């Protein structure tokens, strides 16, 4: 498959990296964003230095601030915008798009307020006559590695297997490979909730704890992610795959992860507002912590790590006290599902 036209909504680090993958596969790629300065840089200098200091983007990759131009004749649309603006952008797409396309998203979060997964948000705003079933593109992937063509394996999840296979063929090449999955709930919740655990793992590092503690929070984090996901209707096997444990490992152990770095800074005593300002990028794990905590409280799901991070971020509890407080929780079996 080649020479498809793909509109990528969001010229951030991951949107730019995915644009290069698609360009390498012979597709026409148009990045859409709202910063004229950034769009001009991509078109004129073929760089995106806010995210990649020393990377040159192929000159065939185009960028625009005009949504109508980006969507014109597109075969597929990929949302890679922050969770909090996904609904707004989806509304704009619905108002602008004039033909049916394959629709994908590669963002990882849950919408604040509604608690909805992003495929649901997009489906609510874009009528069915303009789109396929949403395909979720998710898995263990640092943009910094994908942009230099390091080997990356992720998941294309959709209730429509043919749409998932289309996306699989669209992206896959010698360094980037997709596997299909029909469990959209599992893939989306895994991608969103692992950011919370990454904040916790980073906080342990910032506090000076070693590998034992980090392994514990990642492993028990996977357990509580799975508990909540299954309660929401996910297949538990999904959490042992690329979009589950794979994404949790890459996000919960690496300095490339903005959520891990945010947790590390919290552990070292920095204030959240300073962290967000210094990073200059959206830290999805912060808002997702609140959403996940609220869902867990509503459904009665035991999520001690999420609760500890929530209390630290939103109730002013010390991060060290919150995390160490889990050590005095009631004894439990490792395999409890509630």
From Swiss-Prot:
Chain residues that bind sn-glycerol 3-phosphate: 108, 139, 141, 194, 247, 257-259
Active site: 194 (proton acceptor)
Uppermost EC category: oxidoreductase
Any one Gene Ontology molecular-function term assigned to this protein's record: glycerol-3-phosphate dehydrogenase [NAD(P)+] activity
Keyword field contains Transport: no
UniProt keywords, alphabetically: Cytoplasm, Lipid biosynthesis, Lipid metabolism, NAD, NADP, Nucleotide-binding, Oxidoreductase, Phospholipid biosynthesis, Phospholipid metabolism
GO cellular component, one term: cytosol
Binding, NADPH: 13-14, 108, 143, 258, 282, 284
Location of this chain's protein in the cell: Cytoplasm
Pfam annotation, one family: NAD_Gly3P_dh_N
Protein's pathway: Membrane lipid metabolism; glycerophospholipid metabolism
EC number: 1.1.1.94
GO process annotations (BP): carbohydrate metabolic process; glycerol-3-phosphate biosynthetic process; glycerol-3-phosphate catabolic process; glycerophospholipid metabolic process; phospholipid biosynthetic process
Catalytic activity: sn-glycerol 3-phosphate + NAD(+) = dihydroxyacetone phosphate + NADH + H(+); sn-glycerol 3-phosphate + NADP(+) = dihydroxyacetone phosphate + NADPH + H(+)
Function statement: Catalyzes the reduction of the glycolytic intermediate dihydroxyacetone phosphate (DHAP) to sn-glycerol 3-phosphate (G3P), the key precursor for phospholipid synthesis.
The family this protein is said to belong to: Belongs to the NAD-dependent glycerol-3-phosphate dehydrogenase family.
Protein name: Glycerol-3-phosphate dehydrogenase [NAD(P)+]
Species of origin: Streptococcus uberis (strain ATCC BAA-854 / 0140J)
């Amino acid at each position: 498959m080649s020479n498809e036209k793909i509109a990528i909504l969001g010229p951030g680090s991951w949107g730019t990296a995915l644009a290069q993958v698609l360009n390498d596969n012979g597709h026409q790629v148009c990045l859409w964003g709202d910063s004229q300065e950034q769009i001009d840089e991509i078109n004129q200098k073929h760089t995106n230095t806010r995210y990649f200091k020393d990377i040159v983007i192929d000159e065939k990759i185009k960028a625009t601030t005009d949504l109508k131009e980006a969507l014109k004749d597109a075969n597929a649309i990929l949302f890679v915008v922050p969770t909090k603006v996904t609904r707004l952008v989806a509304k704009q797409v619905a108002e602008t798009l004039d033909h049916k396309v394959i629709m994908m998203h590669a963002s990882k979060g849950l919408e604040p307020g509604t608690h909805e997964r992003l495929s649901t948000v997009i489906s609510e705003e874009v009528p069915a006559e303009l789109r396929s079933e949403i395909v979720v593109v998710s898995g263990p992937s640092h943009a910094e590695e994908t942009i230099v063509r390091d080997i990356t394996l992720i998941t294309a999840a959709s209730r429509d297997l043919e749409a998932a296979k289309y996306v699989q063929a669209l992206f896959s090449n010698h360094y980037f490979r997709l596997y299909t999955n029909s469990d959209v709930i599992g893939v989306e919740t895994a991608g969103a909730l692992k950011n919370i655990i990454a904040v916790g793992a980073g906080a342990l590092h910032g506090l000076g704890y070693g590998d034992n503690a980090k392994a514990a929070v990642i492993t028990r984090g996977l357990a509580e992610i799975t508990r909540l996901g299954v309660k929401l209707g996910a297949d538990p096997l999904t959490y042992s795959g690329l979009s589950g444990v794979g994404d949790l490992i890459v996000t919960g152990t690496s300095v490339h992860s903005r959520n891990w770095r945010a947790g590390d800074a919290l552990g070292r005593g920095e204030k959240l507002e300073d962290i967000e300002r210094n990073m200059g990028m959206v830290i999805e794990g912060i808002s997702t912590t609140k959403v996940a905590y609220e869902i867990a409280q509503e459904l009665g799901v035991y999520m001690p790590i999420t609760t500890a991070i929530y209390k630290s971020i939103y109730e002013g509890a010390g991060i060290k006290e919150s995390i160490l407080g889990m050590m005095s929780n009631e004894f439990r079996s490792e395999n409890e599902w509630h």
